[in-house]
Structure formats: C-alpha cells, structure tokens
Amino acid sequence: MKMLLDDLYEIVEPITADLGYILWGIEVVGSGKLTIRIFIDHENGVSVDDCQIVSKEISAVFDVEDPVSGKYILEVSSPGMNRQIFNIIQAQALVGFNVKAVTLAPVGSQTKFKGVLERVEGNNVILNLEDGKEISFDFDELKKLRVSPDFS
C-alpha cells in the first residue's frame, strides 16, 4: 500500500499544483475495490466545483497512467474542519489545535488520545491531554492524527 501511495502522490501532486491547489493528503481504503480519497486545500477554501475540476483532471491522468489495478472509486474533497494530519509539517502548522491521535501500538493500555497539539519537536508531536498530562509520540508511530474542532 505504501508503494501505491507514493505512486499516487507522484502523479497527483503536480496536477493539483498546476491547478492552483495544495495537495493536503491521499488516503486509500478498502480491499478489492479501493477507494482513493484525495484531499485538496486552497487559501480561499474549496468548493464542490473545485473538487469536480480536480477530479476530472486526475481521472484523465489515471486513465493513461493506470496507477491502480482493477476498479476503484475516486473521491476528491476538502480536508474539512476535522482534517487528518498527514505529515509532520502539517502538524507544525496546527500547533494549538485540539486533536485526536490513534497509535499503531498501545501506549500503556490505550491507543486513542485526545488533547491539544502542544508542540512539535523533530518528528515527535507532543499533546497536552485532557487530564493535563503531556505525552509525546513519534509521528511514524501514529495510525492517525486528526484535528478535533471544539464547538463549545
């Protein structure tokens, strides 16, 4: 799956950049018929029309490059308010935000953590948990890190 993701980034990033968008991230889910989710961002936000434009361009290139064997579903969307954080650079830009983290392996007895993204040090993200404790994770040991908007 890592090789497929690398190939997809290599194909999709220049397309989104040429169209004036930021490639926020790519997620591939499912087995058999895959769903390829491409998240784009723009300083002025992302509309449904933007997603349609990007989707059409990517589909045309995928038809030629054929990066995915078999059938797949292509979804293009904004990362949204509860955006997934795909890399350490994005994490640095989101310091101070409420986040939810899911680890690949249990830390103590838990894999899910919620708190404020306090800071980034090298490849480590440090969260200030709801109970006031700080915890550090190597970014590569996280299954998922996502912004968790506070609506209170």
From Swiss-Prot:
Keyword RNA-binding found: no
Gene Ontology, cellular component aspect: cytosol
CDD domains: YlxS_C
Subcellular location(s) per record: Cytoplasm
Signal peptide from the UniProt entry: none
Role noted for this protein: Required for maturation of 30S ribosomal subunits.
Keywords: Cytoplasm, Ribosome biogenesis
Record PANTHER family: RIBOSOME MATURATION FACTOR RIMP
Pfam families for the chain: DUF150_C, RimP_N
Family assignment from sequence similarity: Belongs to the RimP family.
Top-level taxon: Bacteria
Protein name: Ribosome maturation factor RimP
Gene3D superfamilies: Ribosome maturation factor RimP, C-terminal domain, RimP-like superfamily, N-terminal
BP GO terms, sorted: ribosomal small subunit assembly; translation
